[in-house]
Amino acid sequence: MHPQMKILTLAAVLILAAANAVGQQFQVMEASIADIHRSLQSGKLTCRSLVQQYLDRINAYDQQGPALNAMLYVNPKALEQAEAMDQAFKRGAKLKPLQCIPLVLKDVFDTADMPTTGGSLALKGMQPAKDGFTVARFREAGALILGKTNMHELALAGVTASSLGGQTKNPYELTRTPGGSSGGTGVALAANFATVGTGSDTVNSIRSPASANSLVGMRPTRGLISRAGVIPVSFTQDAVGPITRTVADAAVMLDVMAGYDPDDPVTAFGVGKIPHTYTAFLDRNGLKGARIGVLRTLFGSEPDHQEVNRVMADALEVLKKQGATLVEVNDPAFDTGMLASDLDVQKWEYKYDLNNYLKAQPNPPVHSLAELIATGNYHKPSLEKFLASAEAQQNGLNEPDYKDRRVKIDDLRVRLANALAKDNLVALVYPHQKRLPVMIGNMNQAERNGILASLTGFPAITVPAGFSAPTAGAPIGVPVGIEFLGQPFSEPQLLKIAYSFEQATHARKPPQSTPPLPGK
């Protein structure tokens, strides 16, 4: 070989080795937005190497090994887009809030470059014409959309099973469900397939997978974040929000997602109520002096509730040790089982909402709920009864029962606001789910408490509280989430107390089923 050629070959090898070394210096496990940005700025990390590490983990654990089945689509241009971000950064591009942050979307968020299907075979291949509002915001903020996650089909139940994606497993106990309906996002983040993600929440669906996967899930005040460009369920109850591993990352996500959108007129109520940055409220001492109501109505008292109650008892002690004053709140009007049976309005609004969404799509596989049902291509064990009931509503929004429920929801909103105001409470606290998530095969994710926030539109955040006792199937136990609910647009205060609790406990642990890859 010519001496000059040898020199060039050696140089190429050294460059390749240096590039690989850059990626290997960075530990992707549990990495936060701030961790990634520090490493990008210091030169210890490239966007491409970061994305490659996440892709390697998806390849190793999503369909192989534990076969978690969290991902529906992986962005085929992820590495190409990451390389473009690296080149722009080298040219002096500004570091944006989500610059090079690999993000996964629940498959209800419209994306111009990937299908949006709600996990349904009936909607397979449906390609929106443009990004939804929040997806566009993410791209503007520099995020890299790594892929879209499995979910409980059409966001209509809580065990994360779909006709298109199958059953997603809980990485902490592989025979257990991961919550839902945003369970694919929850599992992807728990298993470190991405940095942050999104969910939608009609009753429990952001906070349930957060609780079940040792994550942070924020359901915002109705009107804070646009729902335009998201497959809907109920215009009264729907919200979208972040799912993350840390409270700080949830605050960054809120900064990007919150804002007025004329395509979702309810966001007009958020104008003037959004701070310059939610990260300003991340205070380790945020619980000091806080008055928090313990909503005993939402705790269980049966043997199935013992593990959750044990974790919650320890969590309440932490709140007190960090300087919070706890006030007992007992109001049977807040019983979530009763609220679900007597006030939930999904059945009356679903056909109206879904049909309007499908009409706005350029070439949908079906054009209405009736056509979707007629295909038979949906998860019948969990959806058949609800879909038939929703389709049977000939004049749903004018039905007397629906109107009566809307009046009761207004009354509930006033009652809840007063429960907080009369005792000068910054928040109410309770377990997100009274018991551990159900095992795979059960179609009912029983005894979740999310509906109080969903009906009223009040904000709530779920944070890791601890784990059940370890078992052979769950070597570190099953995650348990604590939920804080506050007055409308009190997200800053909720983030403050949630961050203080998180920093006092550091309760989150990654699952043992998806360890670091060799050499990574």
Model-derived features: where do they sit?
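Short, surface-exposed loop/helix-turn segments at secondary-structure junctions
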Residues: 125, 267-272, 399-403, 423, ...
